[in-house]
């Protein structure tokens, strides 16, 4: 049985560490958030959404594979910016069910966040070529490449 408060606390701790790391990278390479795409698979997707949407300085875009929103009530209170978001999920995912993509899409739409989604047929909890290609095109479009 999941303890949602424990999960939320741990995700906040990880988010803080992730933001510190991103700040270090931004400083080392003289980057702003507008030059960064956050991306992740499974828990990495969850952290990319939390990190990307709770920073006051918007990221260029967020790409998430096979993830979900960790705690909708918590994230609702903490959203500070928007980014173009692409969520990709396999319809046969038995680790993080595909229904999480639809829930995340609904949540993001209600928060006026530009969301794109792709469900990959006959795909489990992995990133097939079709997902990588879709993500690459989305990233290139967002960076005008």
Which role fits each region the language model picked out?
Residues 80-85:
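Short, proline-enriched alpha-helix->beta-strand connector loops that line the catalytic pocket
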Residues 86-89, 93:
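Short beta-strand/loop motif that positions the catalytic acidic residue
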